[in-house]
Design a protein with these regions (language model features):
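Walker B catalytic acidic pair
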Residues: 214-218
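Loop-centered beta-sheet repeat module
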Residues: 230-237
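Short amphipathic alpha-helical segments, especially helix-boundary/capping motifs
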Residues: 32-33, 48-51, 168-172, 211-213
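Walker A/P-loop-proximal flanking segment of P-loop NTPase domains
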Residues: 1-86
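P-loop NTPase nucleotide-binding core
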Residues: 55-57, 61-209, 219-220
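Conserved ATPase-coupling elements of RecA-like P-loop NTPase cores
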Residues: 220-230
Length: 237
């Protein structure tokens, strides 16, 4: 009986959809034949590698179908082909999947990229964007500190506090969106400037940069006016 209980426990945990298999895991089963006959390494990996300009790819599927596992395989595939990959699951630290909007995701991506790549490129364009809006945002970061008095590391920490409050303090969430949303175009502009500089300073064994944002499918559908958050995130922007 004990052995049966242990077996059931192991089986139950083996099928946990919230714990993807790492690339190269011996438990991986190739379900390509019954999942659309498309290999993510060929469909997305080669497209990313061969494109002469920046591309944006959407990888979708049913919950628990193995998307995260496939994306981790894609990460390993790209890294083996001279690509520097930044991978993160958006719902782990930055967004509340029960209430997520485009602005939340943009801020989450900005924070993650700043923290991951700050030593490889010049983050000043993004930090200057934050500095220009700090008087309007510092109360939402729950701080009275003047950003001009901080070094780069502390400035990035303040940006992280702002994004953390999007997830942790629901009563501030809509106010943060309302103050940031008019400036999303300029934030994207300075973020691209930062990434352009990063791409010039990649490690010697890398010649491309890829960003993989996972778990956006866990966002709950929200309709605000005429458009849903899905349409805003995946179509409009």
């Amino acid at each position: 009986m004990t052995n049966n209980s242990e077996l059931l426990k192991n089986l139950y945990n083996a099928f946990n959809p919230f714990q993807p298999l790492p690339a190269g895991d011996p438990n991986y089963v190739d379900c390509q034949a019954v999942r659309g006959d498309a290999d993510i390494l060929e469909e997305l990996g080669n497209r990313i590698q061969l494109a002469s300009q920046n591309t944006c790819q959407l990888y979708s599927g049913h919950r628990g179908a193995g998307k995260s596992t496939e994306l981790l395989r894609l990460k390993e595939y790209l890294e083996a082909r001279q690509c520097y990959v930044v991978y993160f699951a958006a719902d782990e630290e930055d967004i509340d999947s029960e209430d997520a909007q485009y602005t939340d995701i943009l801020l989450a991506c900005t924070r993650r990229l700043l923290q991951e790549l700050r030593t490889m490129g010049n983050p000043k364009p993004v930090l200057n964007w934050l500095k220009d809006r700090w008087q309007d945002l510092k109360d939402l970061a729950l701080t009275e500190i003047q950003i001009e008095d901080m070094n780069v590391e502390l400035q990035i920490c303040q940006f992280a506090k702002l994004t953390a409050n999007l997830r942790a303090v629901p009563e501030l969430r809509q106010e943060i969106r309302e103050r940031v949303n008019p400036h999303t175009v300029t934030l994207i502009k300075v973020l691209n400037e930062f990434l352009t500089d990063v791409k010039k300073r990649l490690p010697a064994n890398c010649n491309q940069l890829a960003v993989i944002v996972d778990n956006l499918d866990r966002m709950v559908l929200v309709k605000d006016g005429e458009r849903t958050n899905y349409e805003e995130v995946f179509l409009d922007r």
